[in-house]
Amino acid sequence: MAEKFKVESPHVRYLKDVIEADYNYDTTQVYEEKGVTKVKPCSTKFTFHTERKVPKLGVMLVGWGGNNGTTVTAAVLANRLGLSWMTKTGKKVANYYGSLFQSSTACLGSGPAGDVFVPFRDLLPMVHPNDIVFDGWDISSLNLADAMFRAEVLDWQIQEQLRPYMEKMKPRPSIYIPDFIAANQEDRADHTIHGTKAEQVQKIREDIQDFKRTSDVDKVIVLWTANTERFCDIIPGVNDTADNLLKAIENGLEVSPSTMFAVASILEGCAYINGSPQNTFVPGAIELAVQNNVFIGGDDFKSGQTKIKSVLMDFLVSAGLKPVSIVSYNHLGNNDGKNLSAPQQFRSKEISKSNVVDDMVQSNPILYGPNEKPDHCVVIKYVPYVGDSKRAMDEYTSEIMMGGANTIVLHNTCEDSLLASPIILDLVLLTELCQRITFRTETDQEFQTFHSVLSILSFLCKAPLVPAGTPVINAFFRQRNCIENILRACLGLSPQNHMMLEHKMQRSFVSLKRPSTVCNPQPISSKKGNNANGFHLPGISKGLSQSNGLGKNVINSDIEIEN
């Protein structure tokens, strides 16, 4: 899509092939010296390049014939065709509700009538989901129309309209290793790739090549939306390095199907995203991605109960309340629930859903001591009758002032695949956009890409994959602000800081009415920046921008601001 607006600034240049933007990245270093905590504002000048040409995007789904795969394909077709259908509650029209890029907005700034909001998708040139070309693999041989009927997600009238299109779509055979998924999946596995592990990986590579050739797409992204696998052991000499992982595949040692798909995708230069909770990205797979400069991301779609948890925990801890018990119960009846009824597969999901609160707990040492965290229990049960309409019940108990207790109880009915499908779209759209963004600091000679472990996808994942040694962020609004502010940086715009000083002064702030000039760095509060949701005025000036680097420790000592 072409740009819907242009930034008027000497720091932004719309060149023939790229948008070039100069950007001052303001951070805050905190260190201790002779018993005094020193706080030092820092600024680094970046130059961003964003390619303006939007490619024709192909997406290959592992598990294309499953509930998520059929639903996201049906949704894109219905939107592309402009379909509508009747239900008992009235007429429904195809939409992309639930997609960050298609159905939410970002604030550009303020105008004569107040704040100006634009669709998130309009911040930078992006692929429109209507233009995505789908393909993929499945262990079940059903065409997508029959698989859609089996899934029982969409209303019958829309299924009837889509059947002529979807019955022509048939998944390619997939890799099936019974040991990695529940035994109850065996009756679906009538469409599998035979041969050694090396031959199976080679077949996946040939499938990717064939799809590129026959569909005429410019690039391909591969996404795993198949069954949850059991966890893999990290074994020295098997999957601890890229070379060992490739040798393990050659020698037929233990390598999960999801990791085999990752290896094939990486070797074909295709970004690979893991939408399930298992540890697909063993150290060898990550090293292989880094060596080949290919993006990988995951893990596990953050769609319903866990997304609410990342909001509610952020609220409770930020409000100074102390959650001490979180009990999360689910029951669902789709094939995901059937597979998760096996203990090893459930354990993968339990780990993914349990770690979502860690960064919020660690952010407040006033409430939590070392190694202290809430009791956290996750239960998932398989109830076939409820199908894709997952029920989630949560109880949050928090300690409040003077020994009191506060309990919040939630009941959440999650249409599982209808919540996951827009997340699939956002994952591939954001990954594709990041492939067109490069940047450098003023001391760099060459532009670089993002790290191969694409942590900007964290907003969309239960268990975010991040580069080694970097913080894992689960708090919902911090994750969202990260995406928005990086996209703003590509346009030379200051990050959202929500100060709104122009509305808090007795006399008018005249300088806000003209283009800002370089300001001297101002003292930055020692208080932690708030986690607002990004729907307000942009930063007032680079010198006053809220920095992100005060860290997670509250230190009882004198604080000195260095300018």
Swiss-Prot record:
<comment type="pathway">
    <text>Polyol metabolism; myo-inositol biosynthesis; myo-inositol from D-glucose 6-phosphate: step 1/2.</text>
</comment>
<dbReference type="GO" id="GO:0005737">
    <property type="term" value="C:cytoplasm"/>
</dbReference>
<dbReference type="InterPro" id="IPR002587">
    <property type="entry name" value="Myo-inos-1-P_Synthase"/>
</dbReference>
<comment type="function">
    <text>Key enzyme in myo-inositol biosynthesis pathway that catalyzes the conversion of glucose 6-phosphate to 1-myo-inositol 1-phosphate in a NAD-dependent manner. Rate-limiting enzyme in the synthesis of all inositol-containing compounds.</text>
</comment>
<dbReference type="GO" id="GO:0006021">
    <property type="term" value="P:inositol biosynthetic process"/>
</dbReference>
<keyword id="KW-0963">Cytoplasm</keyword>
<dbReference type="Pfam" id="PF07994">
    <property type="entry name" value="NAD_binding_5"/>
</dbReference>
<dbReference type="InterPro" id="IPR036291">
    <property type="entry name" value="NAD(P)-bd_dom_sf"/>
</dbReference>
<keyword id="KW-0398">Inositol biosynthesis</keyword>
<comment type="similarity">
    <text>Belongs to the myo-inositol 1-phosphate synthase family.</text>
</comment>
<keyword id="KW-0413">Isomerase</keyword>
<keyword id="KW-0594">Phospholipid biosynthesis</keyword>
<keyword id="KW-0444">Lipid biosynthesis</keyword>
<dbReference type="GO" id="GO:0008654">
    <property type="term" value="P:phospholipid biosynthetic process"/>
</dbReference>
<keyword id="KW-0520">NAD</keyword>
<keyword id="KW-0443">Lipid metabolism</keyword>
<protein>
    <recommendedName>
        <fullName>Inositol-3-phosphate synthase 1-A</fullName>
        <ecNumber>5.5.1.4</ecNumber>
    </recommendedName>
</protein>
<dbReference type="Pfam" id="PF01658">
    <property type="entry name" value="Inos-1-P_synth"/>
</dbReference>
<dbReference type="GO" id="GO:0004512">
    <property type="term" value="F:inositol-3-phosphate synthase activity"/>
</dbReference>
<dbReference type="InterPro" id="IPR013021">
    <property type="entry name" value="Myo-inos-1-P_Synthase_GAPDH"/>
</dbReference>
<keyword id="KW-1208">Phospholipid metabolism</keyword>
